[in-house]
A protein has these predicted regions:
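N-terminal glycine-/serine-/threonine-rich phosphate-binding loop
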Residues: 1-81
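Structural motif
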Residues: 7-10, 36-39, 68-71, 84-86, ...
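Conserved active-site and cofactor/substrate-binding residues in soluble primary-metabolism enzymes
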Residues: 20, 24, 33, 48, ...
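Active-site histidine-anchored catalytic micro-motif
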Residues: 32-38, 50-55, 65-67, 71-74, ...
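Anionic-ligand-binding alpha/beta catalytic cores of soluble enzymes and soluble regulatory domains
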Residues: 121-182, 186-189
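A conserved acidic, glycine/proline-rich C-terminal tail/linker
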Residues: 179-241
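Generic C-terminus detector
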Residues: 226-264
Length: 264
C-alpha cells in the first residue's frame, strides 16, 4: 500500500497506563517504522473484556483515514493456541488476536494468520505477544508491506456472535452514560414508548444534554446513532445501577381513549 502521508497506527489495549507495556509496544513500532504516527484509542478496556474492546475499537475506527493500521490487544488467551491475525480492507489494516476482538473490522477484509516470529526473528515471549508479535506486524503494515508477507490467508477468523435482538446496555462511557443497542428507527412508529431499566421508567427524550432536567434520567440519540440513557449532572449508570450487558425493555404505551360523558 503506497503512502504519501506518515502512516497512522492506533492502539487499543487493556494494559492500562501504570506499567510500561504500552510504551514498550510503541517503542517497538517506532523502531521498525520511525515515521509512524501513534494514536491511542484506549488502554482502559477492562482486563480481558474482548466484547468491550471490540465495541470501542469499532466505534473509533471509522473516524480514521483510509490506510490506518489498527493494533488491538485484549488477549486473555495469550500464549495459548489462539491465532494471531492481520487483516486488510479498502479502508484500513488491523492486527490482533483471533478471539473476536477484530470481528467488527473483518467484514470484506482479507485475513492472514501471522507467522509466529518475534521482533528479532525468534519466538515471542509467551506473555507479551503485544510487543513481540503484534507490534512488529503493525509496523510492517505501516511501512507498506503486503499483507501476504506476514502469514497465510485464512477464511475462518473468529467473529462475534450476532447482535442480540434483546435491548441491552452495550457500553458505559466515562461520563456514566449507558450506550444501548436500541436503534430509534426500529422502535414501533406511532404512539408513545419508553425504556424500562429495572424499576426505572425512562420516557423523556431530549436532543441535547442541556435540555435534560437535572437529576432526571433521559433518552438521547448518541453520536453513533444509538440510543443512550443519560443523567445531566450525574452518572446514569450509577444512579440506575446499570452495567454493560444489563437488559432493557422498550415498551409501547397504549393511547388512552377519551372518556365518554354519561348522559344526565
Amino acid at each position: 500500500m503506497k503512502r504519501s502521508a506518515p502512516p497512522i497506527v492506533t492502539l487499543t489495549t487493556d494494559f492500562g497506563l501504570r506499567d510500561a507495556y504500552v510504551a514498550e509496544m510503541k517503542g517497538c513500532i517506532l523502531s521498525h517504522c520511525p515515521t509512524a504516527v501513534l494514536v491511542d484509542i484506549s488502554h482502559q478496556i477492562p482486563a480481558g473484556d474482548i466484547e468491550e474492546g471490540a465495541f470501542v475499537l469499532a466505534r473509533a475506527a471509522t473516524s480514521f483515514p483510509p490506510g490506518t493500521v489498527h493494533l488491538a490487544v485484549v488477549d486473555p488467551g495469550v500464549g495459548g493456541n489462539r491465532r494471531a491475525l492481520a487483516a486488510e480492507s479498502p479502508r484500513f489494516r488491523a492486527v490482533g488476536p483471533d478471539n473476536g476482538l477484530l470481528a467488527p473490522l473483518l467484514d470484506a477484509a482479507r485475513v492472514v494468520a501471522l507467522d509466529l516470529d518475534g521482533s528479532d526473528g525468534g519466538q515471542p515471549a509467551a506473555t507479551f505477544h503485544g510487543r513481540d508479535l503484534f507490534a512488529p506486524a503493525a509496523a510492517r503494515l505501516a511501512r507498506g508491506e503486503d499483507l501476504e508477507t506476514l502469514g497465510s490467508f485464512v477464511t475462518d477468523a473468529l467473529i462475534a456472535a450476532p447482535a442480540a435482538a434483546t435491548p441491552a446496555v452495550l457500553h458505559v462511557d466515562h461520563f456514566g452514560n449507558c450506550v444501548t443497542n436500541i436503534d430509534p428507527r426500529q422502535v414501533p412508529a406511532g404512539g408513545r414508548w419508553h425504556v424500562q431499566a429495572g424499576k426505572q421508567r425512562i420516557s423523556l427524550r431530549v436532543r441535547t444534554y442541556s435540555e435534560a432536567p437535572a437529576g432526571e434520567p433521559v433518552l438521547i440519540l448518541g453520536s453513533d446513532g444509538r440510543l443512550e440513557i443519560a443523567l445531566r449532572d450525574g452518572r446514569a449508570a450509577t444512579t440506575l445501577n446499570l452495567a454493560r450487558g444489563d437488559r432493557l425493555e422498550v415498551i409501547q404505551q397504549e393511547s388512552t381513549p377519551p372518556r365518554r360523558e354519561k348522559n344526565s
